[in-house]
UniProtKB/Swiss-Prot annotation:
One Gene Ontology biological process: regulation of DNA-templated transcription
PROSITE patterns assigned: HTH_TFE_IIE
Gene3D superfamilies xref list: Winged helix-like DNA-binding domain superfamily/Winged helix DNA-binding domain (1.10.10.10)
Domain notes for this protein: The winged helix domain is involved in binding to DNA in the preinitiation complex.
UniProt entry keywords in alphabetical sequence: DNA-binding, Transcription, Transcription regulation
Organism: Pyrococcus furiosus (strain ATCC 43587 / DSM 3638 / JCM 8422 / Vc1)
Function as written in the Swiss-Prot or TrEMBL entry: Transcription factor that plays a role in the activation of archaeal genes transcribed by RNA polymerase. Facilitates transcription initiation by enhancing TATA-box recognition by TATA-box-binding protein (Tbp), and transcription factor B (Tfb) and RNA polymerase recruitment. Not absolutely required for transcription in vitro, but particularly important in cases where Tbp or Tfb function is not optimal. It dynamically alters the nucleic acid-binding properties of RNA polymerases by stabilizing the initiation complex and destabilizing elongation complexes.
Quaternary data: Monomer. Interaction with RNA polymerase subunits RpoF and RpoE is necessary for Tfe stimulatory transcription activity. Able to interact with RNA polymerase in the absence of Tbp or DNA promoter. Interacts both with the preinitiation and elongation complexes.
Domain spans labelled HTH TFE/IIEalpha-type: 6-89
Taxonomic path: Archaea, Methanobacteriati, Methanobacteriota, Thermococci, Thermococcales
Keyword Transcription appears in the UniProt entry: yes
Protein family according to the UniProt entry: Belongs to the TFE family.
The protein, known as: Transcription factor E
Length: 195
């Protein structure tokens, strides 16, 4: 995995973990190499408690490590944090597998149920049983519920599942069909073309 790809993946995971504040903490930690939570808070302007939460989440995700140093004068321990990308490919794979399972569950739900909707964006999509309970009227606006065409959602889910399975090596990429070569008819000895 190249340096830029690694950095982008790390920042994406940081954003998932703690939003823009986590991205700032990771950037500061990468730039500094090793720092305490207080130093990171000062560098980023993020509250110390938030920095600690982010660091612990990165540690739980196996993307940060620390070393503990005891101050002989005060007896206090200081934690020096650093980013650890050795396990980044493993973390990315695990996250993709989790996403794949979630997408498969969503596909199962979309294909096993018939849904009903009033057509108003933001209003709930209801299963047959739920729609029946409401007398096939939207619980928000009271409009009639119609069968919901989820074929586009199903196709998008199948496409993303296939992409993830290919990325994870669980499925071979589809083979591209080669264009067929035009065949020439052979001429017979008499000069006429054979069929």
């Amino acid at each position: 995995m190249g340096r830029d790809k690694k950095n982008t993946a790390l920042l994406d995971i940081a954003r998932d973990i703690g939003g823009d504040e986590a991205v700032e903490v990771v950037k500061a930690l990468e730039k500094k190499g090793e720092a305490t939570d207080e130093e990171l808070a000062e560098l980023t302007g993020v509250r110390v408690n938030t920095v600690r939460k982010i660091l612990y989440a990165l540690y739980d995700a196996k993307l940060a490590t620390f070393r503990r140093v005891r101050d002989d004068e005060t007896g206090w321990y200081y934690y020096y944090w650093r980013i650890d990308t050795k396990r980044l490919p493993e973390v990315i794979r695990t996250r993709k597998l989790q996403e794949l399972e979630k997408l498969k569950q969503m596909l199962q739900e979309e294909t096993s149920e018939t849904y009903y909707h009033c057509g108003t964006p933001g209003h709930p999509k209801l299963t047959f049983d739920e729609a029946f309970e409401y007398g096939f009227q939207c619980p928000i606006c009271g409009e009639i519920l119609y069968e919901y065409d989820n074929s586009k959602i199903i196709e998008e889910l199948k496409k993303r599942i296939e992409e993830l399975e290919i990325e994870l090596g669980l499925r071979s990429p589809p083979k591209e069909e080669k264009p067929k070569k035009a065949t020439r008819r052979k001429k017979s000895r008499s000069g006429k073309k054979k069929k």
